[in-house]
Amino acid sequence: MKKIMIIEDDTIISKELYELLVNAGYEALILKDFSNAKEEILKSNIDLILLDINIPYQNGEQLLKEIRKETNIPVIMVTSRANETDEILSISYGADDYITKPYSPTILLLRISADLARIGR
């Protein structure tokens, strides 16, 4: 079973994503301690990350840059920021995909599946 980490500061959205992933057959993990996000990611043996840009302690794009220094785990940015600049920055920092809220659950699941298949996970 593929394990997906949710890094989202909005607890309602985190729970919605969790339920969506579990119902689709994934193992889901919600990151609750944002102060040690990179360390939690590296020790959790996950297959994919859903990452919001607006998270406590540091910007999600900065966390993405740090993640990319250590691992090639697929990262999908899931954010309310629908401007081109944030999307360009996220992709240039190594995001595999960029989805804006509100998102279509079907589209999100298809993109997760495609990103996992692309890297053979």
What are these regions, as identified by a protein language model?
Residues 1-120:
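N-terminal/domain-start alpha-helical segments
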